């Protein structure tokens, strides 16, 4: 079994679904599916999450913590199967640029076997973080349902 990236502040575990976990925080109400990469190209492990924040109007919103700080002049690309998505990023964090991109990425994750996030690190060395997607769709659904009332 893969290590699950369980946030320190997580209040309730909704469930563990293969390499993905689903969690709910009570205040502010938010739910998320989260996993660590099965292969990290950087110095830390990083994580990928898909969160639902009812009060912010966010549903199934992607966030990736990269395994190393990226060169800010380089882009970040997420790939699932044949689909490639450019992400918005700062030093360590990357996310979809808008809601339609979030929906397209999550749809690709649901049908994919693996997902990779590629960037160039500070110093010019490329790196890639790879995620297994087994259990991702179930964890994402559980997170959405976990916050459906709140």
Regions found by a protein language model. Name each.
Residues 5-7:
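N-terminal signal peptide c-region/cleavage motif recognized by signal peptidases
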Residues 9-150:
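A generic "folded-domain core" signal
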